[in-house]
Amino acid sequence: MSAQSRKSNSHNGKNSRVNPEIKFKLETLTELFPDWTNDDLIDLVHEYDDLETIIDKITSGAVTRWDEVKKPSKKERLEKRLEQQQQLQKEQQQHQLQQQHYHAQDLDGHHGGSSSHHHTKAGQGSGSRYSRDNNGTHSSSGGSNAKSKKQQQQQQQQQNGKPSLPSDNARAAISRGKPASGGGSWAAVASSDSKKHQQEEEEEEDQQQQRPESSPEEPSATTVQASETKTDGVEASASATSTAQSSTHATATASTGNAAHNEKPKKMSWAAIAAPKPKVVQKKQSSLNNVGGLKKEINEVAKETETPAAGQAQREPVSETNDKATNNQGKKADAQHEDTASKLSEQQQQQQEQLQAQQQEQQQTQQQDQSPIEFQSQGTNQEDTAQHNRPEEQKDTREITSNQVQIDEQEVAATSEPQEPSQTAQAVATEVNDGSKVKQQQQQPTVGVEAGKPQQQQQQEAYYQQQQQQQQQQQQQYFAQQQQYAQSQTPQHAPQQLSGQQAAVGQPNANANASANANAAAAATAAQQQYYMYQNQFPGYTYPGMFDSPSYAYGQQQAYQQPSQPSAQAGFGTGTASQYSIPQGYAAAPAADMTTASTATASPVAGHAQPQQQQPYGGSFLPYYAHFYQQSFPYAQPQYGMAGQYPYQVPKAGYNYYQPQRQTQGRNVQQGQQSPGHSPSQQGEDVQQQSQPTQQNQLQNGQQPLNPQQLQFQQYYQFQQQQQAAAAAAAAAAAQQGLPYGYTGYDYTSQASRGFY
């Protein structure tokens, strides 16, 4: 064993232990491939049996021999890098050519234009580089004084360094692509270039990170701002030179110095990256009339930015430009303040302005009913309200939902006018606190606002409030109904809940009062029975273990137990009527009485189960087999688990299957004749009623009333007699009806039948 393992582990060219086959293969392979050593080949030979496959793999290069891992030499590395750089430069050049083309068009088109663009944009606090004047001095936008100084210095340097600065960019870029462009070594150029490229990428990332923080009036403006703040001098100067001097663009002389070549296109790279975006903005900005479109675009931007502060900042400038157009409320001064201030103070001011705007809006909505004409005269504010209006309604509805109860108490006839100011004030408060709401509101500007809008708004608010009140009242009514229903019908809830509900709601009908106690107990047993999954939902469902213990007999919450009966449910105080058990009054009553109103009121079972009370298939609940047993066997089957009285299966007296009847027959008859609407539900009543009929019975028989113990014994005796009589009587019915072999025949509380399953 050790030899084998050694053999497999140590084939290192000494083929002494290798068997002759492998030796032969190795020799042929070394002849074919003289540069392969045995060490290289031996693993292959072990892996593939067939010589041909090995040869095939080696020749096709699928298999290579072990070799030293070498670092590529410096020359190789440089060559590779040069190739990469050249490719990169070609791509860049194509890009730049396109960009410069656009750029020249832009500059020629727009710098000749009126300087009003510069003022409005500067007013908005965007540090766009198009707000610079042609001579290279900058209107101080967004606090960029230091920046502009830097850029001017760099421009001067460039002008000193080169005879004609904005030489034809396209040609410069092309000439740079030629490797034989001058004295400098290509390696130096390439390395410096790659560094530049990395810087550019980093700065782009920086921009993207900054973009959500800075307030995005227009996407391009902020990107340019970011680039100017974050870039080193080279790129800033590039943007400056590319924009500031459009006049000399026409004169194009190719610059000769190699250094000029290296710097020039590199500088352009930033302009190339940043240029296409400003182009779009310029087109937008040139049409100040198209305020609606601008607003839409700005709102889209607002959706993109995540920070709510940015959203606020972004919404203000639009209204500011409109204000400037109509110089209405002297917000112009505010705006220019903002520009010199830092961004934080911008946001604070804008919040304040929003507050002002909303207060104005409130005043307007209050003035509205008196004078719609005023509103039209306030030209600019229309747009503000347009932006606010819908959000206001939203907020109102929100608040109404949160303050439902207050509204109910405060105003039963809701005329929204007196209330509205306070609500809008609340709305203002919530808006300042909650930036996200602000964002949602900005996304729905409506541009043309009819003067009547606030009236509509008020009407709508009134409508909302009325709706809310109606809903609340309905809910309360519904609750009351539910509770009554729960009390008069099924106790699906836990007993604690039930009692709470009873306390809360005065029962309207005396019937509910009567059944209240019964219900508490019913709830308890129902909760107990919920343990079996389907018992309450599906009346026909049974399974073998179901009837083992008295408390889980099918559908059996023992109806109106007598105090004398000890059972599992004595703890609940009162027994309760349940799905299939019929209140005592009907124990001996004819089956016709089954469907009378009394059963409906007395049993707490939900409506859908009630028709089942008249036991549908001849008293059996075998859901699927019922017809077989009933139709095909018209005779009764002997019932083996029965407790002695009668060997066939028999329903207990008058369909009341599971409850042993502890009353005298006299009592049964009387109670059947008693008012069917009255079913005893409380224990005190039970005791009285129970003792009354028995006493009457005895008095009729001319006997003395007995003391309780005797009475109990006599009741028990009578009960047995009655049961036997009932069993005998029912045997005939059973023979006709063909009762199923099953559950209904026994007394579940008696010991004798206990072990049947």
Swiss-Prot record:
Q: Which residues pair up as cystines? A: none
Superkingdom of origin: Eukaryota
Q: Which GO terms describe its molecular function?
A: DNA binding; ubiquitin binding
Q: Where is the composition biased (Basic and acidic residues)?
A: 69-83, 294-306, 331-341, 385-399
Q: How is it modified after translation?
A: Ubiquitinated. Proteolytically cleaved by the proteasome in response to transcription stress; the resulting N-terminal form constitutes the activated nuclear form and the C-terminal portion is degraded.
Indicate, by first and last residue, each region the UniProt record lists as having compositional bias (Polar residues).
Answer: 1-18, 371-384, 416-427, 490-504
Gene Ontology cellular-component terms listed: chromosome, telomeric region; cytoplasm; nucleus
Localization recorded for this chain is: Cytoplasm; Nucleus; Chromosome, Telomere
UniProt keyword Repeat, yes or no? no
Q: Note whether Transferase occurs among the keywords.
A: no
Biased composition (Low complexity) is annotated at 84-101, 134-159, 209-220, 236-260, 346-370, 455-489, 509-521, 556-571
Keywords, comma-separated and alphabetical? Chromosome, Cytoplasm, DNA damage, DNA repair, DNA-binding, Nucleus, Telomere, Ubl conjugation, Ubl conjugation pathway
What GO biological process terms does the UniProt entry carry, in alphabetical order?
DNA repair
Domain CUE residues, every copy: 21-63
Stored InterPro entries: CUE, DEF1_CUE
| Region (Disordered) residue spans | 1-20, 69-521, 556-575, 664-703
Q: Which family does it belong to?
A: Belongs to the DEF1 family.
Cited function: Recruits the ubiquitination machinery to RNA polymerase II for polyubiquitination, removal and degradation, when the transcription-coupled repair (TCR) factor RAD26 fails to efficiently displace stalled RNA polymerase II. Also involved in telomere length regulation. Binds DNA.
Q: How does it assemble?
A: Homodimer; may form higher order oligomers. Interacts with the large RNA polymerase II subunit RPO21; the interaction is direct and serves to bridge RPO21 to the Elongin complex in a manner dependent on transcription stress. Interacts with RAD26.
Instruction: State what protein this is by name.
Output: RNA polymerase II degradation factor 1
Q: Which organism is it from?
A: Zygosaccharomyces rouxii (strain ATCC 2623 / CBS 732 / NBRC 1130 / NCYC 568 / NRRL Y-229)
